[in-house]
Amino acid sequence: MIVKVFDYIYISNVYNANDIYELIKLNIGGVLTCFDCTCIEWCHHNDTNVTNKIFYKDIFVNTKKDLIKCDVPIITNKSVNSDIIGGTHQINNYYNEQNNNYHDNTYKEFTQTHKTNIDPSQIKSDHINEERKEHYDYIIFPSDIINNTQCNNNNLKDYIKSMLILKEDAYIDFDVIHMDQLKNKHNNNNNNNNNNNNNNNNNNNNNNCCTFKNPDISNTSQHHVEHIQIHKSNSHSNIPSDNINFCNKKYDKNLSRSVEISEKDKHPENSLLYEFVNKDKLNYKINQEEDTVSSEKNKLCDNNNNNNMVHTRHIYNVCELNKCLRENKLIPYNNIYKMKHLYLNILDTFDENILKHVNKAHLFIDSVIQKKKNILIHCMAGISRCSSIILSYVSKKNKKGIEYNFNLLKSKYPFAHPNENFYRQLLLYEKMNYTLDGCTDYHNIYKKIKMNRENLEELKILNLKNDKQPIYNFRCKHCNYVLFNDNEIIKHDFKISKIKKNYGNSCTSIFIEKKEWILTENKMKGVLNCPNVNCNIKLGKWSWTGICCSCGYLQIPAFMINSSNVDRMNISKTV
């Protein structure tokens, strides 16, 4: 389940994060994985700054051109483009020229760039930092996934299944042309067409009528004739290159429809036949123009004097994509989805310092949102780590506090539940005014935590939640081990979960916050046992998907203890 929780921000678990075509449908341009894993199926894991692997349907296939993998080059003996190191704005336009000897010898050099050797001492590798850099993954997709409203989540999987099956050793190639040459070509064509249109308009004004070669529509009304003339005077040189492939759908449809309306008054019985005739004529004309554009584009690709690229055309639906793959044609770069990805190695434990990851995570989230793309933040179960990162980011932006945003997050995604350690650190982050550098008492506490994670225990003493002093402790009835206090009991919130019918009126269970002694790693539900090794008796159960109380209230997530297994003791008497 992928859920939108805030503007531009989605949350899920690792299983849903693998639904790459659903992510494309949701316009997600970046994925933040809050644990170190290699189970993202569409992510190609390697240590190079380029890749020749691209994800298609459910496998990786090879590409005949290298694609940028990372913004910063990895330490190698090879030379890299010095222009790439400075920023990310040229990433789309850079293609590695090395390792290009393929079996078919069809690979051609795309860029001629100035190269310089990088001093390895100036670059910190992944092994030194023990952190993964953000990288890019590439996915082949038909544009219909984004543009077609009928392609929803219900039939998206069937739509993907209809894509052509390829072997893992298959090679595909994609298509690029030079932006400057294309721009000049289009400008010249636009100027010529504008002059032609002006001459035509002058002739039409002098003649006070509109004349066409086709005699069947020469006597139509002025309004309909003008509408027809607009479509007929257009050409591919006036249409942006990204829309060339849509001409057959929009261009001839409008013209045929206009002709049909015009002819209904004269020959209503022949309007359909007339439409087919004009469609054939127009399709023939468009096919000729497409052949011309394609030949010009191929010439431009052979004259590679600049690495500033623009990508043309679209494959609109899966049928066109399958045909293109069967005939070994070039895949338009517009049908290659570029996904930004970052791994954060966060452990869901009670001694993990999650605040050391927030600055890197926030920069990554901003870089995705600034491009008007959505971002998916997920962890293994989609509960603790990802929700903690989301709370830190949103609270820093809106300044409404961790508790307020946590309640808002749970109202949209009930599974969100940072562990007790993470939540205390988030409250400390709020006390530090969402900064990690400072000279306040709270900043000094965080500096101690950075030096030694054992100092996280000090956060328990600070009472960052501003809770009242607890009155009761709850102990195991069999061994008298202290389990929790009354401040850690979760009361029923009937505004969030409705009470189910046909249940009793009394509660026989107690729901508590997640405690350190509750082990939930890599599981969705389990049994709550006494943490005392000599006892280990069953106290209750837990589930990330929720448990229903005896009164009918549904608690999500739930850590439920049977009231008959614990004793309530006054704290003043136990001291």
Swiss-Prot record:
<dbReference type="GO" id="GO:0008270">
    <property type="term" value="F:zinc ion binding"/>
</dbReference>
<comment type="subunit">
    <text>Interacts with PES.</text>
</comment>
<feature type="binding site">
    <location>
        <position position="476"/>
    </location>
    <ligand>
        <name>Zn(2+)</name>
    </ligand>
</feature>
<dbReference type="InterPro" id="IPR016130">
    <property type="entry name" value="Tyr_Pase_AS"/>
</dbReference>
<dbReference type="InterPro" id="IPR020422">
    <property type="entry name" value="TYR_PHOSPHATASE_DUAL_dom"/>
</dbReference>
<keyword id="KW-0862">Zinc</keyword>
<dbReference type="GO" id="GO:0004722">
    <property type="term" value="F:protein serine/threonine phosphatase activity"/>
</dbReference>
<dbReference type="InterPro" id="IPR029021">
    <property type="entry name" value="Prot-tyrosine_phosphatase-like"/>
</dbReference>
<comment type="similarity">
    <text>Belongs to the protein-tyrosine phosphatase family. Non-receptor class dual specificity subfamily.</text>
</comment>
<dbReference type="GO" id="GO:0070262">
    <property type="term" value="P:peptidyl-serine dephosphorylation"/>
</dbReference>
<dbReference type="GO" id="GO:0008138">
    <property type="term" value="F:protein tyrosine/serine/threonine phosphatase activity"/>
</dbReference>
<keyword id="KW-0904">Protein phosphatase</keyword>
<dbReference type="GO" id="GO:0005634">
    <property type="term" value="C:nucleus"/>
</dbReference>
<dbReference type="GO" id="GO:0046823">
    <property type="term" value="P:negative regulation of nucleocytoplasmic transport"/>
</dbReference>
<dbReference type="InterPro" id="IPR000387">
    <property type="entry name" value="Tyr_Pase_dom"/>
</dbReference>
<feature type="region of interest" description="Disordered">
    <location>
        <begin position="185"/>
        <end position="213"/>
    </location>
</feature>
<dbReference type="GO" id="GO:0004725">
    <property type="term" value="F:protein tyrosine phosphatase activity"/>
</dbReference>
<keyword id="KW-0963">Cytoplasm</keyword>
<keyword id="KW-0378">Hydrolase</keyword>
<dbReference type="GO" id="GO:0005737">
    <property type="term" value="C:cytoplasm"/>
</dbReference>
<feature type="domain" description="Tyrosine-protein phosphatase">
    <location>
        <begin position="283"/>
        <end position="435"/>
    </location>
</feature>
<protein>
    <recommendedName>
        <fullName>Dual specificity protein phosphatase YVH1</fullName>
        <ecNumber>3.1.3.16</ecNumber>
        <ecNumber>3.1.3.48</ecNumber>
    </recommendedName>
</protein>
<dbReference type="GO" id="GO:0017056">
    <property type="term" value="F:structural constituent of nuclear pore"/>
</dbReference>
<dbReference type="Pfam" id="PF00782">
    <property type="entry name" value="DSPc"/>
</dbReference>
<keyword id="KW-0479">Metal-binding</keyword>
<feature type="binding site">
    <location>
        <position position="530"/>
    </location>
    <ligand>
        <name>Zn(2+)</name>
    </ligand>
</feature>
<comment type="function">
    <text>Dual specificity protein phosphatase which dephosphorylates both phosphotyrosine and phosphoserine residues.</text>
</comment>
<feature type="active site" description="Phosphocysteine intermediate">
    <location>
        <position position="379"/>
    </location>
</feature>
<dbReference type="InterPro" id="IPR000340">
    <property type="entry name" value="Dual-sp_phosphatase_cat-dom"/>
</dbReference>
<dbReference type="GO" id="GO:0060284">
    <property type="term" value="P:regulation of cell development"/>
</dbReference>
<keyword id="KW-0539">Nucleus</keyword>
<dbReference type="GO" id="GO:0006468">
    <property type="term" value="P:protein phosphorylation"/>
</dbReference>
<feature type="compositionally biased region" description="Low complexity">
    <location>
        <begin position="187"/>
        <end position="208"/>
    </location>
</feature>
